[in-house]
Curated annotation (Swiss-Prot):
Its EC number is 3.6.5.-. InterPro entries: Gpn, Gpn2, P-loop_NTPase. The gene is QQT1. Small GTPase that is essential for the correct formation of the tangential divisions in early embryos. Associates with microtubule during mitosis and may function in the positioning of the division plane. May participate in the patterning of the early embryo at the octant-dermatogen transition. Is crucial for normal development of the plant. One of its GO terms (biological process) is chloroplast organization. Its main location: cytoplasm. CDD domains: GPN2 (cd17871). This is GPN-loop GTPase QQT1.
């Protein structure tokens, strides 16, 4: 049984930086980590790859040969990977004995909530290699500063969760920079817990662009609340406590926390519940740490 993370998110959300930082953190914890780069457009990697899709196919070659743009080229690459899944399986098998796997995916979001190739690749790997994976979706925290962008990020997160069908952790990345993006309309816990979205209506009406689609946005918010699946944790990749809290969540979601444990059902339950870590207190501490200067200016 092999554990790992599927790192996804829009362009610029910090996926490659996350993989690099998470790899270093887990290595310090004593885990052997292998990063699998499945982004054929990422040719400036800050980490050493265990597997690199560029050995199979390159985006620039696809664009040149088939006269495709970047998005069409990435879709082609994922379809090509799906058809050549044996190549990826053969590359992963030597790592299965003792490695924790990080999959670094492209940032084109349509690959994760519309197109099926990425989902099919992961499904085949999970079945053939007995993988236990958690999808970690990174959302840049600056999107919280704009109500319309925040609702869009919620809709993206929900759509991806439903489409990928994996244990899922949504992350507001770059939380250390949130104080520089501008003042939030509400406390940070409003955005992490996805509280009553009707409170956003007033702020949406202040923006002429959002006001035009006010009714549509209201209906989308209703869909998000009806499913009640989306919430966020926060991440400062340079802060070991922040990364450690995220690792705990991921380990619970993919079952790593139970690996190698021979215990009764009662003991498993104790481990699963663990020591109570109140989200409100944790998020309040994050707000105080990273948004203190903004509050002083007020």
């Amino acid at each position: 049984m092999v554990f790992g993370q599927v790192v996804i998110g829009p362009p610029g959300s910090g996926k490659t930086t996350y993989c690099n930082g998470m790899s270093q953190f887990l290595s310090l914890m004593g885990r052997k980590v292998a990063i699998v780069n499945l982004d054929p457009a990422n040719d400036a990697l800050p980490y050493e790859c265990g597997v690199n899709i560029e050995e199979l196919i390159k985006l620039e070659d696809v664009m040149s040969e088939h006269s495709l743009g970047p998005n069409g080229g990435l879709v082609y690459c994922m379809e090509y990977l799906e058809k050549n899944i044996d190549w990826l399986e053969s590359k992963l098998k030597p790592l299965l004995k003792d490695h924790y796997i990080l999959f670094d995916f492209p940032g084109q979001v349509e690959l994760f909530f519309i197109h099926d190739s990425t989902k099919n690749v992961l499904t085949k790997l999970i079945k053939s290699l007995n993988l236990r994976l958690t999808a970690v979706q990174l959302i840049d925290s600056h999107l919280c500063c704009d109500p319309g962008n925040y609702v869009s990020s919620l809709l993206l997160s929900l759509s991806t969760m439903l489409h990928m069908e994996l244990p899922h952790v949504n992350v507001l990345s770059k939380i250390d920079l949130i104080g520089s993006y501008g003042k939030l309309a509400f406390n940070l816990d409003f955005y992490t817990d996805v509280q009553d979205l009707s409170y956003l209506e007033h702020h949406l009406s202040q923006d002429p662009r959002s006001a035009k689609y006010r009714k549509l946005t209201k209906e989308l918010c209703s869909v998000i609340e009806d499913y009640s699946l989306v919430n966020f944790t926060t991440l400062d990749i340079q802060d070991k406590e922040s990364v450690g809290d995220l690792v705990k969540l991921i380990d619970k979601s993919n079952g790593y926390i139970f690996a190698g444990i021979d215990a009764s059902v009662v003991e498993y339950s104790k481990i699963a519940i663990g020591q109570t870590d109140w989200d409100y207190n944790r998020v309040a501490a994050v707000q105080e740490k990273y948004m203190e200067d903004e509050e002083i200016q007020d």
